[in-house]
Amino acid sequence: MRLKTLKFPFVNKKNTRTFKKKCGRFLSYFIGLTVALTFLFRFVPIPFSAYMAEQKLAHIIQLDFDYKVNYDWISLEDISPYMQLAVIAAEDQNFPNHGGFDWNAIKSAIKYNEKSSRIRGASTISQQTAKNMFLWHGQSWIRKGIEVPVTFMLETLWSKKRILEVYLNIAEFGNGIFGVEAASRYYFKKPAKRLTQSEAALLAAVLPNPIIYKANRPSLLVRKKQAWIIRQMNSLGLNYLKKL
C-alpha cells in the first residue's frame, strides 16, 4: 500500500518567495529610513531614541503608567570636558582613531571569553550610539548584524564630535534617566557643564548597567571603577579631546 506524502499548503516555493520578498522590502525600507534619519540627525537634536521608546513601551505593557522618560538635549559645548573624557576613558579609549570598530579590542574580548565564564564586550561608542538610536537591546545575532552597517553609516555621515554628543545625550544613566544633562541634574543638582572630574567618572562608571550600578548609591565595585576611570582620564589628559 502506497502512503501519500503529506503536503502543507503554507510551505511551498511561492510562499517562500513571497516571504523573502517581504523581508527584502522591509529591509530596504529600514535601511532607507535609517539613512534618512542619520543624515537628518547630523544637524538637529534627537527627539527620542529607539531604546527610550522600547523602555516606555515595555513599562506600558507591564501596566506601569508612571514610568517617565527624563531627557534633556544639550549641545556638546554644554557638557563638561571631564564628562566627555570620562566616557572615552571608560568605554572606548581608541574612539578618536577607529572607524567604528576597535578590532584589537574585539580580538582581546574573544580571547578573554574563550577562557572565562564571564562575557566581556568590545562595543565602541559608535556601536553603542547606533544601538541606542535605532535598534533594540539584548543579545541577538540579528541585531548585531544590523548594527554593523548602521555603525558604518554613523561614522560616514557624522563627525566624531557628533557621535559623542549624541551618545552622551541618549545613554541611560538610571531608571528612565537618559542623557548626561538629566543625569547631572538628578544626581548632582547641577547642569552637565559644571560636572567635576569625580562626578563625571561616577556617571561613566554606571554606564555598563545603570539599573544595577547606581550613581546615587554606588557600590564598592562602582567606586573602584570610578577610581580606575579617574586614573585613565589623568593618563589621557583633556588634550585628548582635541583629536576628535
From Swiss-Prot:
Record flagged with keyword Cytoplasm: no
Pathway noted in the entry: Cell wall biogenesis; peptidoglycan biosynthesis
Any one GO MF annotation of this record: pentosyltransferase activity
Broadest EC class assigned to this enzyme: transferase
Pfam families: Transgly (PF00912)
Family: Belongs to the glycosyltransferase 51 family.
HAMAP family to which the protein is assigned, alphabetical: PGT_MtgA
Protein name: Biosynthetic peptidoglycan transglycosylase
This protein's encoding gene: mtgA
